[in-house]
Amino acid sequence: MGLPWYRVHTVVLNDPGRLIAVHLMHTALVSGWAGSMALYEISVFDPSDPVLNPMWRQGMFVIPFMTRLGVTKSWGGWSITGESVSNPGIWSYEGVATAHILLSGALFMAAIWHWVFWDLELFRDPRTGEPALDLPKIFGIHLFLSGLLCFGFGAFHVTGLYGPGIWVSDPYGITGSVQPVEPAWGPEGFDPFNPGGIASHHIAAGILGILAGLFHLSVRPPQRLYKALRMGNVETVLSSSIAAVFWAAFVVSGTMWYGSAATPIELFGPTRYQWDQGFFQQEIEKRVQGSLASGASLSDAWAKIPEKLSFYDYIGNNPAKGGLFRAGAMNSGDGIAAGWLGHPVFTDKAGNELFVRRMPTFFETFPVLLVDKDGVVRADVPFRRAESKYSIEQVGVSVTFYGGELDGVTFNDPSTVKKYARRAQLGSVFEFDRATLQSDGVFRSSPRGWFTFGHLWFALLFFFGHIWHGARTIFRDVFGGIDPDLDDQVEFGAFQKLGDVTTRRQAV
């Protein structure tokens, strides 16, 4: 059968045994990829500095998903939190990866078995002996089993009743760890940033799935509904399955890009909106003002700011800064963060404190402007020095660092002041090692950006797939045309109803 590449799935259209085989093989490939990718990531991952060199800066993609489900230790003796471990147990990163590879092998063998032994009695209607599938019953079975799995995950794994719990952190991504979660049954459960909603929604959705599965197993669909929704056609199953998948892809694209309890910033990096809204900057300022109010010096106040919080407040960690087609991890762009230099305070020769205006997300270059507390521009780094009125040299700007590695150091020479003004544009000032990875200085996106981009495209593609296959199954009679096996000659005008020999027109 000479089929073009885009029609090859026709071979399993009326072959339930081999339909199962190709699904088993597909799951084997997915499971095998996940396990192999996990082992690769573990082999290149550097766990030594979870603060300045976290997994999302290193371009890890599957490790964050394993971690959010409760896997934090390695057979290599390290933990995701940076400490050493002596007994990681079976369910370490390597253990989970190995389990996926073993599952892949088992599924591979099952796929071969079902491809060879495709013509099973199970797939034949006992009344007619013809191949037939009871699709509404199969739907009920799948709904029941997926509901059971969903309920089990929410009631046991997430709550810690029989499992580790999930990754839970504070809004600023400082204190994250794997812990049991109490289900949230009130309105607070609908807050996308409340981990309690993950437990309660899985429990509720699981119960609904179990009940719906039992309903579809015990109640047959009405004949008219069966025919109207083409429930006897396996392409209907394909179309509705694609609909479920594209909807899920759209939803997870949103929860990943905008952030949620299921996508913690410690594992996937900050969102672009946290930079746009000055989320971390405001929290840092609040903490500093609190320390100053309690009598601390400016140096002490800034020294109390966690380095982790400062690092989030850096534009290079914004997933929207990396171009979609710039391959590589964030560390391949601006380098590996080596240390926080401190908070720079700029002053002019009159003693006015100046603030560097931060670069917006969608700018590659932005003028370096230093404004006073009223927002008036007092100094800048001009594009054309001949026309400059507010240059660093003319205004006499100096910079003093508080907290960090340069605590208490003041720079007066214009070239150094301009260097730190340019870097203050990008948020917190950090020193980067660009030599180790031969980083090119061009920002990259985080796994948050890759996941969103990939799943949005998958969702769009699958949306059109749903429309295509849905139209094919609903309008199958139209596309199929008139049955060539009709004994009577069919012609327009011969019958009142085309092809119905009982409605032959009488000659006048």
Swiss-Prot record:
Note on cofactor: Binds multiple chlorophylls. PSII binds additional chlorophylls, carotenoids and specific lipids.
The keyword Membrane is annotated on this UniProt entry: yes
Listed GO biological process terms: photosynthetic electron transport in photosystem II
Subcellular localization(s) per the UniProt record: Plastid, Chloroplast thylakoid membrane
MF terms (GO), sorted A to Z: chlorophyll binding; electron transporter, transferring electrons within the cyclic electron transport pathway of photosynthesis activity
Entry keywords, A to Z: Chlorophyll, Chloroplast, Chromophore, Membrane, Photosynthesis, Photosystem II, Plastid, Thylakoid, Transmembrane, Transmembrane helix
CC annotations in GO: chloroplast thylakoid membrane; photosystem II
Membrane-traversing stretches: 21-36, 101-115, 140-156, 203-218, 237-252, 457-472
Alphabetized Gene3D superfamilies for the sequence: Photosystem II CP47 reaction center protein
Pfam families the record matches: PSII
Membrane topology: Multi-pass membrane protein
Membership in a protein family: Belongs to the PsbB/PsbC family. PsbB subfamily.
Record's subunit section: PSII is composed of 1 copy each of membrane proteins PsbA, PsbB, PsbC, PsbD, PsbE, PsbF, PsbH, PsbI, PsbJ, PsbK, PsbL, PsbM, PsbT, PsbX, PsbY, PsbZ, Psb30/Ycf12, at least 3 peripheral proteins of the oxygen-evolving complex and a large number of cofactors. It forms dimeric complexes.
Protein function: One of the components of the core complex of photosystem II (PSII). It binds chlorophyll and helps catalyze the primary light-induced photochemical processes of PSII. PSII is a light-driven water:plastoquinone oxidoreductase, using light energy to abstract electrons from H(2)O, generating O(2) and a proton gradient subsequently used for ATP formation.
Name of the protein: Photosystem II CP47 reaction center protein
Phylogenetic classification of the source organism: Eukaryota, Viridiplantae, Chlorophyta, Nephroselmidophyceae, Nephroselmidales
